[in-house]
């Protein structure tokens, strides 16, 4: 029985990056031996155990053989005779197929993962890559994480991803898994690499067609020097990651704010009149299909519908600003206004040449919101107002507070 550290912990250590959870593989043991040593079985589909003291996951070395369509159709063999090399062969990428002996510290790298780390290449381990559609999503997610370190995807890996997209294999992806991977991407440093990897291999069209449809749709060059809406989508996602690191909530709203531009009739290009309204329906359909949590949906729909109003904030009347805050649910969910401001700033700065531009509308929106939020309905009730009178007086008082805050700014 031998124990090896495998996967991300080894990869990240070799990259000099902070390591997350540690995963271990056990060679030459069976389930009875593991339990006799105090390991607690937790794997439903695979022989996985928790260490009796550390609680870390230890899995028996295993092979997997494709037995059906999708990512669940596998036959697992965890016999004690399965070797370390056989276990590593089933893994997705060479950089994840590196093991380190727990006792000696010796590194085992049968598939060239160390070389690929040095050359900054994301490469699949073997032809079994095509058997699991989730690996296409994982490839794109790894690119979102590793692209800032200079990684590129191996041409042969991109070709396999394209083959999987063309074959219809990606249709078997469970929506919840797509959302799980997307949410992890939106907390990464460079979400654009996820989008670009999937788009270039044809996988984005199969997995997230609403996002893929934006590529090739032109915008007015005086407002969008990058022209292509798909490129703008990438730039906005990266800017959101820069402005709100690790905030997938803001990232999702930024990613989906312009879906309506894909619905503009080509004869109207490069203008996109009312795209902020047209984008709500495909956004809601996307959220429904992926079973996106409500807080993500609500902020995304708000940003889609209102981002142009925030851009035009200096032109809006005080009453219109109050109506905007109400539509954004800014009085019941105060945090939403700061989130919306970040999304809109990412939109404005996610354009070629505007990356370092100022966006005064963001702080201004939060300032007038704070002024209006300071008006309390309980104070009005204490003045003897009742029922609808309180609502009317509250709106009037908040509009006056907005006006005062704006006048002080001027």
From Swiss-Prot:
Classification via SUPFAM superfamilies: Nucleotidyltransferase, Poly A polymerase C-terminal region-like
Cofactor or coenzyme needed: Mg(2+); Ni(2+)
A Pfam family reported for this protein in Swiss-Prot or TrEMBL: PolyA_pol_RNAbd
Molecular function GO terms recorded: ATP binding; CCA tRNA nucleotidyltransferase activity; CCACCA tRNA nucleotidyltransferase activity; cyclic-nucleotide phosphodiesterase activity; magnesium ion binding; phosphatase activity; tRNA binding
Domain HD residues, every copy: 229-347
Binding-site positions, CTP: 8, 11, 91, 138, 141
Domain of life per record: Bacteria
Catalytic activity: a tRNA precursor + 2 CTP + ATP = a tRNA with a 3' CCA end + 3 diphosphate; a tRNA with a 3' CCA end + 2 CTP + ATP = a tRNA with a 3' CCACCA end + 3 diphosphate
Transmembrane segments: none
NCBIfam families: PRK10885.1 (NF008137)
Subunit details: Monomer. Can also form homodimers and oligomers.
Additional comment: A single active site specifically recognizes both ATP and CTP and is responsible for their addition.
PANTHER family: MULTIFUNCTIONAL CCA PROTEIN (PTHR47545:SF1)
Name of the protein in its database record: Multifunctional CCA protein
């Amino acid at each position: 029985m031998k124990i090896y550290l495998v996967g991300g912990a080894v990869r990240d250590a070799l990259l000099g990056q902070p390591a997350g959870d540690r995963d271990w593989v056990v060679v030459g043991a069976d389930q009875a031996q593991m339990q006799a040593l105090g390991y607690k079985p937790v794997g439903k589909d695979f022989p996985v155990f928790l260490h009796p003291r550390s609680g870390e996951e230890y899995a028996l070395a295993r092979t997997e053989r494709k037995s059906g369509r999708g990512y669940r159709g596998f036959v697992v063999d965890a016999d004690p005779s399965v070797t370390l090399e056989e276990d590593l062969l089933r893994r997705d990428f060479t950089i994840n197929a590196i093991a380190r002996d727990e006792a000696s510290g010796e590194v085992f790298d049968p598939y060239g993962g160390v070389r690929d780390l040095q050359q900054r290449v994301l490469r699949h381990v073997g032809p079994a890559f095509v058997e699991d559609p989730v690996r296409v999503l994982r490839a794109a997610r790894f690119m979102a994480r590793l692209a800032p370190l200079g990684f590129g995807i191996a041409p042969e890996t991109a070709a396999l991803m394209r083959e999987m997209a063309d074959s219809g294999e990606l249709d078997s992806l469970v929506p919840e898994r797509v959302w799980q991977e997307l949410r992890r991407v939106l907390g990464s440093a460079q979400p654009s690499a996820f989008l670009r990897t999937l788009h270039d291999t044809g996988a984005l069209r199969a997995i997230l067609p609403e996002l893929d449809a934006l590529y090739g749709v032109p915008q007015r060059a005086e407002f969008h020097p990058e022209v292509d809406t798909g490129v703008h989508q990438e730039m906005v996602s990266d800017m959101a990651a820069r402005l709100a690191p690790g905030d997938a909530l803001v990232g999702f709203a930024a990613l989906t704010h312009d879906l309506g531009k894909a619905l503009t009739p080509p004869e109207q290009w490069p203008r996109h009149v009312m795209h902020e309204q047209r984008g709500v329906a495909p956004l809601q359909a996307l959220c429904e299909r992926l079973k996106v949590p409500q807080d993500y949906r609500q902020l995304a729909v708000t940003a889609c519908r209102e981002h142009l109003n925030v851009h035009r904030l200096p032109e809006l009347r005080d009453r219109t600003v109050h109506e905007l805050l109400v539509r954004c649910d800014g009085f019941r969910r105060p945090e939403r206004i700061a989130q919306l401001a970040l999304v809109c700033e990412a939109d404005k700065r996610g354009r070629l040449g505007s990356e370092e531009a100022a966006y005064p509308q963001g702080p201004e929106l939060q300032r007038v919101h704070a002024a209006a939020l300071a008006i309390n309905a309980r104070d009005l009730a204490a003045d003897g107002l009742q029922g609808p009178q309180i609502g009317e007086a509250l709106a009037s008082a908040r509009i006056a507070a907005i006006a005062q805050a704006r006048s002080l700014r001027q």
